[in-house]
Amino acid sequence: QINADPNIPEERKMIFSVSKIFKKDFEGLAIYEKSDGEGSIVVSVQGSNGYALIDRASLKLKSFVTIIDGPEVDGTSDTDGIEVSNLSTSKYKKGILVVQDGFNDDGYQNFKIIDWNKISK
């Protein structure tokens, strides 16, 4: 954790270290903000092919999710970048998580759009 205010002296704080879930190679970072200031920090953990949802206030791990193969779309792996939106739409009531999928059998990288409701439970 590093303060973003340049007028405050830098003081780094370890939040998570490499572990069974947090394997090396953290790649993407996004913030899901709720209207009350609460929300999640989402971290792409490329070494684990998954995504950590961390509580913004407590900095505690809320959940760790992976996106697996489904009947129509494959899962994700080797994610470099992510983004999240809390914008409500008719299809995605609480927003979306967009992840870059770095490996596919056909050789083409792509993006997956995930319903925030499905990963934030």
Task: State what each model feature region is.
Residues 1-121:
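Sequence/structural signature of beta-propeller domains
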